[in-house]
Amino acid sequence: MSESTIGIIVNGATGRMGYRQHLVRSLLAIHGQGGVVTKDGTRQQIEIMIIGRNEATLKELAAKHGIEHYTTDLDAALADPRWQIYFDALVTQARVKGIKKAIAAGKHVYTEKPTAESSEEAFELARLAKEAGVKNGVVHDKLYLPGLQKLKRLIDSGFFGQILSVRGEFGYWVFEGDWQQAQRPSWNYRSEDGGGIIVDMFPHWNYVFENLFGRVESVYARTATHIPTRVGEDGEAYTATADDAAYGVFDLAGGIVAQVNSSWVVRVDRKELVEFQVDGTLGSAVVGLFGAKIQPRNATPRPTWNPDLAETHDYTADWLEIPTNEVFENGFKTQWEQFLLHVIEDAPHPYDFTAGARGVLLAEAGLESNATGRRIDLPNT
């Protein structure tokens, strides 16, 4: 490995997200293009070390993708100065221990979300990283989706006027695992293993809200475990102890009201698996993973309520599709490149451990709201 090469420890490369989005779509793609381009125009190459518990699995994965370095010994990898960055894609329960070790070893740290199971631990990680002087970042992948980037442009252009409300629909039907294999791992449905849709999705909604609309000031949430029994990877039935749906109302800074339904027990009747409708005084938009359509004020139809006559107007035809006039790369890869440049030349990357901790805090507040039946205020952290 060259002295100028950035060494990255990847812990959790055999998992669903760690493998597909981070290892294959991001890091191997960055390595294949020769690294990242710095502001002076030079390329900084990366080298990858994958870590896991099963050496045979790691060996097979390394051979498949031409990765030279792999190990089951995290401590030894962290002690090696060739590896400057530690990335964590483990299950949430195992995350804090590894990150603390990496910080203590002086490594820069990038991690999947949520950063911890509790906001106390999440803010502790932020404090430890700051005290150690290491760069730190948390995956904020939804911000890099083509649809949300188009939405950001609309907001920055003033298209909406005053933004009034945000409505979000996320989810799809995850099969129960009996007659059809589930698309998500069984631990997602066990609270004792760190599962639940609130702890998974509310951190996402937090960074979407605070980066596009304004920070979350309060939340009212209702959760449900609609399907109480599922079938695991071993073919055995198990009790689902975690929420599989969450219905949230969020008060955002500036008086914006947001409402998001998150569910793994909903059948999709929309163009994409997530859609947000943003309504403002001067116009509205509906955006998804890729698509975005708008309806300006001066092209808004004037409906009238008449239950005696069948509706003949096609309201979906009143929207104008935003053209895709640039190539959007994989969002995980784009953020990886930003974090690497943050490490190499202190380029901006605001999505740090403190931002990640605010997401954990919102998830906790959502669970507290569900338990108490109250709206929960959030501190400005």
Question: Where do the model's predicted regions map?
Answer:
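N-terminal Rossmann-like dinucleotide-binding module
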Residues: 1-65
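C-terminal capping/lid region of NAD(P)-dependent oxidoreductase domains
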Residues: 3, 161-165, 368-381
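C-terminal glycine/acidic-rich active-site capping loop/insertion
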Residues: 7, 231-239, 247, 251-252, ...
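Short acidic low-complexity segments
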Residues: 39-40, 69-81
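Beta-strand-loop-alpha-helix segment that lines the small-molecule cofactor/substrate pocket
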Residues: 84-85, 91-92, 96-143, 158
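Hydrophobic residues in well-ordered beta-strands that form the structural core
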Residues: 111, 136-138, 167, 260, ...
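Predominantly a Rossmann-like dinucleotide-binding segment in NAD(P)-dependent oxidoreductases
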Residues: 142-240, 373
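Glycine-rich phosphate/pyrophosphate-binding beta-alpha loops
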Residues: 203, 262-269, 327
